[in-house]
Amino acid sequence: MRAQGDRYIGIMSGTSMDGADAVLVDFSGERPAVLAAAHEPFPDALRADFGQLQQPGDNEIHREALAANALARVYAGCVTTLLGQAGLQAGDVAAIGAHGQTIRHRPGLYDEIGYTRQSQHPALLAELAGIDVVADFRSRDVAAGGQGAPLVPALHQALFGDGAEARVVCNIGGISNISVLPGDSGAVIGFDCGPGNALLDYWIGEQLGMPYDDDGAWAASGRVDEALLAACLADPYFNAAPPKSTGRDLFHPAWLEARLATRSGPALSPADVQATLAALTAEAIARDVRAHAAPAKRLIVCGGGARNGYIMRRLAQALPGVAVQTTEDFGVPVSQVEAIAFAWLARQCLLRLPGNVATVTGAAGPRVLGAIYPR
């Protein structure tokens, strides 16, 4: 007999494309309890493959299929690590919620429905792990006229909401997004703000060969170029009204290079560009907080950007009167929030309960999200 209880695994590989974050969560209590956590870095070749698949290219179907196989093996490695940490067997887990790697996200375009594509091989993961897998969470919301993103605001409300005050939860991954949590009975809203770490990671990789800017130290050594910042913020996405979502297929290296190419004036140092990109991330978030969450007095940050001290300081400067904290101040590691969300979404699917918030995504209504791949 399988003694699964209410234990689920959530695995998230986000737009930063640095690897997979995974958690084993017990939902039997009042709050989710993380029993184990793991991070599995992507091999360089897999990260490069997913980077190339963000934009049109040759032989995409073949390359995506092989990348999906490789990702399933990375995810299966996470599962093995989690079970070992917790001293559990595959039969002790109800399901895995596997997000996959977003390679295109274009809801509402082309034919009014558009599409979103997360590369992965859930059937292979189920085969390797011996656990039911729930995947493809976003497409059902898109089919209902929604953006398919963000999907974590419902969990943000459960973990960080407070009936006594309005709060904002901000995830800074490759793309940044916010969840506005009202302090009353008002509706939760959420949307993508713009680039988070994606362009920062690209630029430091190109210039210094480093995967990321540790604590934002390189950005802090440069100066913000106001002309370049204004050119970036002139992109129509920043002034579009929510619900809205975006991805690396908009904010990609060519997007940055085009703005650098049209800039006039004295030459910028590479560190100046990095400082300006960090300022772009912070300013896009701050603008949206001011426009859509004016009563909020607390901004709670998660994701890799929460460890970028330069961005965090810029946020505090741009939002006077707002306490800027991280989810770790509330007992949740910054790297675990989205993985917990996909464990929760898998549970919602198996229980046939909605996983989206229609006021966030713009969908026609609540929908059960995900497709089930039995073990």
Curated annotation (Swiss-Prot):
Q: Name one Pfam family in it.
A: AnmK
Q: InterPro entries, per this entry?
A: Anhydro_N_Ac-Mur_kinase (IPR005338), ATPase_NBD (IPR043129)
- The answer to whether the entry has keyword Membrane is no
Q: Its pathway?
A: Amino-sugar metabolism; 1,6-anhydro-N-acetylmuramate degradation; Cell wall biogenesis; peptidoglycan recycling
Signal peptide limits: none
EC annotation from Swiss-Prot or TrEMBL? 2.7.1.170
GO biological process per UniProt: 1,6-anhydro-N-acetyl-beta-muramic acid catabolic process; amino sugar metabolic process; peptidoglycan turnover
Q: List UniProt keywords, sorted A-Z.
A: ATP-binding, Carbohydrate metabolism, Kinase, Nucleotide-binding, Transferase
UniProt xrefs under SUPFAM superfamilies: Actin-like ATPase domain (SSF53067)
Give the residues the record marks as binding ATP. 14-21
Q: Which reaction does it catalyse?
A: 1,6-anhydro-N-acetyl-beta-muramate + ATP + H2O = N-acetyl-D-muramate 6-phosphate + ADP + H(+)
The record's listing under PANTHER family reads: ANHYDRO-N-ACETYLMURAMIC ACID KINASE
Role summary = Catalyzes the specific phosphorylation of 1,6-anhydro-N-acetylmuramic acid (anhMurNAc) with the simultaneous cleavage of the 1,6-anhydro ring, generating MurNAc-6-P. Is required for the utilization of anhMurNAc either imported from the medium or derived from its own cell wall murein, and thus plays a role in cell wall recycling.
Q: Please give the name of this protein.
A: Anhydro-N-acetylmuramic acid kinase
Q: Which gene name belongs to this protein?
A: anmK
